[in-house]
Swiss-Prot record:
Gene3D superfamilies: 3.30.420.40, Actin, Chain A, domain 4
UniProt lineage: Eukaryota, Metazoa, Spiralia, Lophotrochozoa, Mollusca
UniProt entry keywords in alphabetical sequence: ATP-binding, Cytoplasm, Cytoskeleton, Hydrolase, Nucleotide-binding
Entry GO CC: cytoplasm; cytoskeleton
Localisation per UniProt entry: Cytoplasm, Cytoskeleton
Pfam families, A to Z: Actin
Family: Belongs to the actin family.
Organism expressing this protein natively: Crassostrea virginica (Eastern oyster)
Record protein name field: Actin
InterPro entries reported in the protein's UniProt record: Actin, Actin/actin-like_CS, ATPase_NBD
Catalytic reaction list: ATP + H2O = ADP + phosphate + H(+)
Function field: Actins are highly conserved proteins that are involved in various types of cell motility and are ubiquitously expressed in all eukaryotic cells.
Keyword Cell membrane attached: no
GO terms of molecular function: ATP binding; hydrolase activity
This enzyme's EC code(s): 3.6.4.-
């Protein structure tokens, strides 16, 4: 149904006249891929189709074929090591923590400040606050101390009804959960450790190439400061002489689409 809507209402194209490029999540089961293929050929009569892994397209969009992609969207985050265009499935890690959880967490900590956000409409407001005002601290404890001793980190936000709210340490406490999932009561490792674990599951000969090409992708990697913090945290985990580079392309929110566009025009 959603594909039908996309073809006929949004794109307004005849699917039988165009080859189709579909994307899939890392570790997508073979049955899903078969079903996608069946629908494209049998329902829409596509002349040709290809299914690409989202993280691989993000890597292509950054102009690379080897690297590790940290892809974090609304529902799930993945770390995907890729060597010469091929994802390495045995080393892919999944983290059930992403944008939606951060919005929920921000709703919770704003409630502690005395603001009440409960309805779906209010949730959208909190998502907007998250996208506009949140950032990742380079040193969380130090930032907490700064926030406690001065109002320099405070920002105000005007709600649709004209009420103005002030947000302080919530600005960086919210995305900190990506590095410390314990904030959300989760026992999993943060995105820095997950990336490190992915690299360590790869052949020792390619680790150097992965450390030097850590590519961020997806809307939940859009927080200011996230690349520097990632660099700092991975450097702490990695061997001392290792060169580590985190790449955060400005268009990373749409890098899967951009990579698909590149692949489709080859």
């Amino acid at each position: 149904k959603i594909w039908h809507h996309t073809f006929y209402n949004e794109l307004r194209v005849a699917p039988e006249e165009h080859p189709v490029l579909l994307t899939e999540a890392p570790l997508n089961p073979k049955a899903n891929r078969e079903k996608m293929t069946q629908i494209m050929f049998e329902t829409f009569n596509s002349p040709a189709m290809y299914v690409a892994i989202q993280a691989v397209l993000s890597l292509y969009a950054s102009g690379r074929t080897t690297g590790i992609v940290l892809d974090s969207g609304d529902g799930v985050s993945h770390t995907v090591p890729i060597y010469e265009g091929y994802a390495l499935p045995h080393a892919i890690m999944r983290l059930d923590l992403a944008g939606r959880d951060l919005t929920d967490y921000l709703m919770k900590i704003l409630t502690e400040r005395g603001y009440s956000f409960t309805t779906t409409a209010e949730r959208e407001i909190v998502r907007d606050i998250k996208e506009k005002l949140c950032y990742v601290a380079l040193d969380f404890e130090q930032e907490m101390a700064t926030a406690a001793s001065s109002s320099s980190l405070e920002k105000s936000y005007e709600l649709p009804d004209g009420q103005v709210i002030t947000i302080g340490n919530e600005r960086f406490r919210c995305p900190e959960a990506m590095f410390q999932p314990s904030f959300l009561g989760m026992e999993s490792a943060g995105i820095h450790e997950t990336s490190y674990q992915s690299i360590m599951k790869c052949d020792v000969d390619i680790r150097k190439d992965l450390y030097a090409n850590i590519v961020l992708s997806g809307g939940t990697t859009m927080f200011p400061g996230i690349a520097d913090r990632m660099q700092k945290e991975v450097t702490t985990l990695a061997p001392p002489t290792m060169k580590i580079k985190v790449i955060a392309p400005p268009e990373r929110k749409y890098s899967v689409w951009i990579g698909g566009s590149i692949l489709a025009s080859l």
